[in-house]
Amino acid sequence: MTMFQYYKRSRHFVFSAFIAFVFVLLCQNTAFARASSNGDLPTKADLQAQLDSLNKQKDLSAQDKLVQQDLTDTLATLDKIDRIKEETVQLRQKVAEAPEKMRQATAALTALSDVDNDEETRKILSTLSLRQLETRVAQALDDLQNAQNDLASYNSQLVSLQTQPERVQNAMYNASQQLQQIRSRLDGTDVGETALRPSQKVLMQAQQALLNAEIDQQRKSLEGNTVLQDTLQKQRDYVTANSARLEHQLQLLQEAVNSKRLTLTEKTAQEAVSPDEAARIQANPLVKQELEINQQLSQRLITATENGNQLMQQNIKVKNWLERALQSERNIKEQIAVLKGSLLLSRILYQQQQTLPSADELENMTNRIADLRLEQFEVNQQRDALFQSDAFVNKLEEGHTNEVNSEVHDALLQVVDMRRELLDQLNKQLGNQLMMAINLQINQQQLMSVSKNLKSILTQQIFWVNSNRPMDWDWIKAFPQSLKDEFKSMKITVNWQKAWPAVFIAFLAGLPLLLIAGLIHWRLGWLKAYQQKLASAVGSLRNDSQLNTPKAILIDLIRALPVCLIILAVGLILLTMQLNISELLWSFSKKLAIFWLVFGLCWKVLEKNGVAVRHFGMPEQQTSHWRRQIVRISLALLPIHFWSVVAELSPLHLMDDVLGQAMIFFNLLLIAFLVWPMCRESWRDKESHTMRLVTITVLSIIPIALMVLTATGYFYTTLRLAGRWIETVYLVIIWNLLYQTVLRGLSVAARRIAWRRALARRQNLVKEGAEGAEPPEEPTIALEQVNQQTLRITMLLMFALFGVMFWAIWSDLITVFSYLDSITLWHYNGTEAGAAVVKNVTMGSLLFAIIASMVAWALIRNLPGLLEVLVLSRLNMRQGASYAITTILNYIIIAVGAMTVFGSLGVSWDKLQWLAAALSVGLGFGLQEIFGNFVSGLIILFERPVRIGDTVTIGSFSGTVSKIRIRATTITDFDRKEVIIPNKAFVTERLINWSLTDTTTRLVIRLGVAYGSDLEKVRKVLLKAATEHPRVMHEPMPEVFFTAFGASTLDHELRLYVRELRDRSRTVDELNRTIDQLCRENDINIAFNQLEVHLHNEKGDEVTEVKRDYKGDDPTPAVG
């Protein structure tokens, strides 16, 4: 192959030097082998006799068993030597016969050029019968199949011969290393090695002879490599030319078959149209009607024959495609296995990718098969109706008795018989069509399956194979000469004779685009004025609307369209100019039009007093900065656009493209410098969403990663990823515009709701006769006051849309990452169907584990909250139930995520369960309290003795439950202090839940009255105070009890119930005040302890009363 010649020349010197070095080593090893063998190796008969003698012995010692094994291995080695010598002889014979085979192939190839004239061939074929032609078609198909098989065999052998130098190099090097080890062992120079047994020495000498035979065979194969390659190439050229001749011959045969079938069909049709009756009978209306039906059937028969011929040709074409695809699949696997990691492999892969059949070239046969079945069913129904000709004719003659006589009756019978024959032939043709359509569908399905598999293999391999040389020092030194050669190879050709008419037609086709662009430019002033009108309405409650921002963005989009339309029109003209790069320029113009549409729209939105400033409220300084950045980034992206188109349409041109490699590298470096400040600003913005930060960070890191790929030679991979990266940038820009538009729409809606509420309050004040102040015209509401549920649902839909579009951009490259499954990191033992197997943990498994961890983290962060907003908040659930559900859901996500991650890394559940059991036992003792609190937390969530919002008392702490976590529960006491209590306390200690099932609680107010008080009056006073209080429940009724005779009081208790816990303190306060007031009004003394002090002098007969001088500070004793 020509694509291998450069590669072979570049390796010639390396192989020559390596073969010379190995030859010197082999001469030394061969001389030593002959000197140390002390003659020839023992014969097989001698060895077999010794082995038989050992086998006859019943009891063998350990030494005898070793000798027995040595003899068996030596016999096997001698067999291999004989086989290799035989293969070497065959190789020599094959090399000797190669020139004669090449001469024969050359002569046969020359003979093929003297082909017969097509006209003479057609004349000869026209004399053959249809059966003879069909026999020749079958024979030609068999010959073509054999030729395709020979071509596949020759291609496979050529691949093996072209990649033989690498295999010979590795084999001879390994053999020389093994010979060196055997020589050292036979010499006894290895320190610490035991002495060789005689049988073991013979075995090693046999192994030495085997290696020498293998090396001799490899050397002979390398010597005959060029001759065999030339012979196979010539044979392949002959088979290729012969296949083309057979295909042409098959086409002529098929044309002859089609012509023969069509002639027979037309003859039948003519017989149907012109029966042997008189013109008078044919003029009969009934006969004429039936003859017209026969004529229609004859036309259907001709059409069916033509369709059958087309299906036959399509079958042949698809069958050839299928054979070539299967051959390519076999060859590509061998080439990948041998040439893995070389630049030659990338060239081969690019060529194979260009020859893949497209699905657009295949016809969908499902509907056609269904139509054929339906048509055949209708034909069979018509045939069944004609089974009894007389009955059918009699039925036709009903109602036409005046027009029918015996001659007309006979004519109708003849017409019906002819129709039956036509239907039989039509049914046969439809059956043949159906059979060929089904075969064609099967072949197409096989072809698409093989093509899909081949495309997947090519996509994976091309993506992970370096397409260019690395940008190292050698690349830099060779850059000037490589650049000079690249400029010399650039040629742009144009066929002016064919180009001018096509350019005129393309100009007419592009004229509507130019007219639309001119119309938009003409109405540009009106569009700007209308946009300013929309901008002036922003902020006004009477004129502002949620549609104002989409309208303004649509106007900016229309303003950006003229340049896009002009680019497309120019690209259309270049496409028709018959340039050798017309297709490339047309594809680039389409990408450039989309590029301008997105970045032009962004430029218009960010202009002074544009949508970003007037609608989104961005500062003008910030929009100016972003406009400058967009200009710089867009200019840096243009070369990447062009070379990404080259990578899609003509990847072979990238192989020696040092200019593109250097330009893309420095463009990516420039983009990295431009994008990184934007990423830094987003991280400094504290209001940025996490997903937005992650997206911008990834988009900023990608240029640096692409630079590394370009520098290491993965130029094609860089361009493929760069194209998707640019499309992702488009998505981010459009998504941000949509995001800001939605947020402004929600803000406008919130302001309108607030305005309506203000108007409603004003109307209520007017109705009540209290006219308030005029409400402000434009009440402002911060974005944080927008309904949070609506905002979160909107964000969920926005991110879902972003995910769908992101998948649509990158889905065609997802399959390339399956290549990571071929990179094994480590192994582990597993079971399948009860059998122990060794499984691999690949790079793909590690990537899946990372993605699963990220997905689990995202679900833990967002799913419980979204579930609360979307579902739980709309259900009538008990207090705290939604919190329990979301918490348990978090635990489930963590468990499933951990099992998925560990399972993908080779830690299956059957291993995890023992680990979990061991950890449970070990940690159960060391972390007993923590595990106890964790289990208690689960009990609390499931059994729900306490819930979020319950008022509880545990020990000396009382308050409201605010949080239930894995280890502890948080209680907010009545002093608004948060108390952290371990979960175990709620399960093991006594707990008072004041609001578990009912918030009704009892209050006890104790009162002591003085001795001598009217007890019945006291009872009435206490009951009156309780029954008249609005918060005291009447069922159960308040009760008063005289509980005890105190030291100085008559003790009473007022027992009553209140509905809510928050009413307890206020009710006690108000009842105490009421009771005090009623006791004063009813002369009931509330008793209290009194103490009298008497002072005696030393004699004991004088009492001194202490009186306080209220004018001074010191008491003045008074003696009385």
UniProtKB/Swiss-Prot annotation:
InterPro entries: ATPase_P-typ_TM_dom_sf (IPR023298), LSM_dom_sf (IPR010920), MS_channel_1st (IPR049142), MS_channel_C (IPR049278), MscS-like_channel (IPR052702), MscS_beta-dom_sf (IPR023408), MscS_channel_2nd (IPR006685), MscS_channel_C_sf (IPR011066). It is a multi-pass membrane protein. The keyword Cytoplasm does not apply. Its main location: membrane. The chain crosses the membrane at residues 500-520, 561-581, 583-603, 635-655, 658-678, 693-713, 729-749, 797-817, 840-860, 887-907, 922-942. Residues 521-560, 604-634, 679-692, 750-796, 861-886, 943-1120 are cytoplasmic. Residues 43-98, 126-266, 360-422, 1057-1081 form a coiled coil. Pfam families: MS_channel_1st, MS_channel_2nd, MS_channel_3rd, MscS_porin, MscS_TM. The keyword Signal applies. One of its GO terms (molecular function) is mechanosensitive monoatomic ion channel activity. Residues 1-33 form the signal peptide. PANTHER family: MECHANOSENSITIVE CHANNEL MSCK (PTHR30347:SF1), POTASSIUM CHANNEL RELATED (PTHR30347). This is Mechanosensitive channel MscK. It comes from Escherichia coli (strain K12).
